[in-house]
């Protein structure tokens, strides 16, 4: 074990200590020892599989495509509404034609070339409103149907029999966390009937998993960016998401220890579930729930769930527009400060927003054991800090430039590996807006509490992404793990 591997190992416990410093209740009797020990064991187990057992790579790749058919089904409905231009078939690019600039012999570099003589093809790309939001509507209706037939109630009860006695996690928490391995905020829809009765600790854990992991759709976009420099990236991104769930659980439980008894601490009988609203009725408007307590037919349940999914999508859009608008204003204000006369303008050119974010994330980046080289360490810290405002896409693109030699080549193999893991989660302000918007729509009766908990969950999600990076840093190069082979480089 090298010195950097040791730093990564110590960093895991350092992150737990930071979470404890911000805990709502630092009484030792409420410290979640079982969850911490089991959560770390699961992370180290997944890390050992992906770094030391190449056979596991194919299994993880298969897992990442498990929900492909579900998302294709959602796309089929969206394609009928919005058309093939905005919702193309799987594996196809959609584009529109623009005339070639007069006098130019070729198309711009960001186009796909001359599709027909004299016309350039411009990719439409992934449009959030036409691709992500229809998935929310479809899954909301589908999950409501599953609750109507009793599938998720059965799964929750089965999980509860093992999870709560063993590790003090409720069945609803486990169900929501497991869903995060495959989807994003849609995982909260999976446990929607339980949200109103969840304890603060449970709700924080569910929200934290949304921030500390990434959906299958996001992983696909990350793979398309990183594969040229990291050919074997897909199983590692899937592993990062799988490790992110236990990391979020243990960190959120340290931040907000469980001091109450969860509703799903024990199996819930069908009669008690119906009386408590744990059914497809949870996917209808709360006023209708009081007026019409009778059970819905399967068709009614699915349609009501889809209608509620539309409300969730609208709430997500509103929150996202607000948050990204505020971020834009912040960037604009700081850029204006750089135009002030010297020496103030010069000072703000140095104390820029990326540098401030880099300073903020530097201690956590050090904990991952990413490098002993100051330049590599600092630039890695800036990239991770930028994720807070820019999402992971632009930092990943910067990594590609840093590895391929476009500009200054500064990313080594170890830094590439750890950055890939650390940046993979949804721990950024854009997704904070998505989670807040969805959570308020899912459980409007706890609106004030949800907004407060989202900040705690956001912190847990951020720390979880660093913890996943620490796990990757610990396994890099030890026990015979060949970093070149792990990356898939020839």
Question: What do these predicted ranges mean?
Answer:
Residues 11-22, 39-51, 136-144, 216, ...:
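Hydrophobic core segments of alpha-helical transmembrane domains in multi-pass membrane transport
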């Amino acid at each position: 074990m090298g010195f950097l591997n040791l730093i990564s190992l110590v960093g895991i416990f350092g992150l737990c200590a930071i979470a404890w410093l911000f805990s709502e209740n630092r009484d030792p009797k409420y410290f979640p020892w079982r969850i911490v020990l089991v959560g770390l064991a699961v992370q180290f187990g997944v890390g050992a599989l992906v770094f030391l057992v190449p056979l596991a790579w194919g299994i993880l790749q298969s897992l990442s495509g498990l929900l492909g058919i579900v998302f294709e089904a959602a796309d089929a409905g969206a394609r009928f509404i919005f058309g093939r231009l905005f919702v193309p078939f799987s594996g196809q690019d959609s584009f529109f034609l623009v005339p070639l600039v007069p006098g130019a012999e070729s198309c711009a570099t960001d186009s796909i070339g001359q599709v027909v003589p004299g016309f350039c093809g411009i990719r439409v790309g992934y449009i959030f409103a036409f691709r992500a939001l229809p998935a929310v509507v479809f899954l909301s209706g589908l999950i409501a149907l599953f609750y109507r037939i009793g599938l998720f109630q059965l799964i929750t009860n089965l999980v509860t029999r093992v999870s709560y006695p063993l590790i003090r996690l409720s069945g609803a928490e486990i169900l929501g966390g497991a869903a995060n391995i495959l989807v994003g905020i849609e995982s909260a829809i999976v446990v929607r009937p339980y949200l109103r009765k969840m304890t603060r600790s449970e709700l924080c854990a569910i929200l934290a998993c949304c921030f500390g992991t990434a959906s299958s759709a996001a992983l696909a976009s990350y793979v398309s960016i990183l594969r040229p420099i990291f050919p074997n990236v897909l199983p590692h991104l899937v592993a990062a998401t799988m490790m992110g769930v236990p990391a979020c659980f243990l960190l959120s439980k340290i931040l907000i220890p469980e001091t109450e008894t969860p509703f799903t601490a024990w199996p819930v009988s069908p009669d008690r579930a119906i009386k408590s609203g744990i059914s497809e009725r949870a996917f209808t408007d709360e006023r209708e729930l009081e007026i019409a307590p009778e059970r819905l037919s399967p068709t009614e349940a699915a349609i009501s769930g889809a209608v509620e999914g539309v409300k969730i999508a609208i709430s997500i859009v509103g929150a996202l527009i607000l948050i990204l608008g505020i971020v834009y204003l912040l960037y604009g204000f700081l850029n204006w400060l750089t135009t002030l006369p010297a020496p103030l303008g010069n000072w703000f050119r140095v104390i820029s927003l990326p540098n401030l974010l880099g300073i903020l994330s530097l201690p956590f980046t050090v904990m991952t054991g990413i490098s002993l080289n100051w330049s590599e360490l600092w630039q890695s810290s800036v990239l991770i800090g930028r994720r807070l405002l820019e999402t992971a896409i632009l930092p990943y693109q910067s990594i590609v430039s840093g590895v391929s030699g476009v500009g200054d080549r500064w990313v080594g193999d170890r830094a590439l590996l750890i950055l890939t893991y650390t940046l993979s989660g949804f721990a950024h302000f854009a997704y904070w807006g998505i989670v807040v918007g969805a959570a308020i729509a899912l459980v409007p009766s706890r609106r004030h509490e949800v907004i407060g908990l989202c900040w705690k969950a956001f912190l847990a999600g951020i720390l979880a992404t660093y913890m996943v990076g620490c796990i990757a840093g610990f396994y890099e190069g030890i026990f015979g793990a060949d970093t070149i082979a792990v990356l898939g480089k020839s």
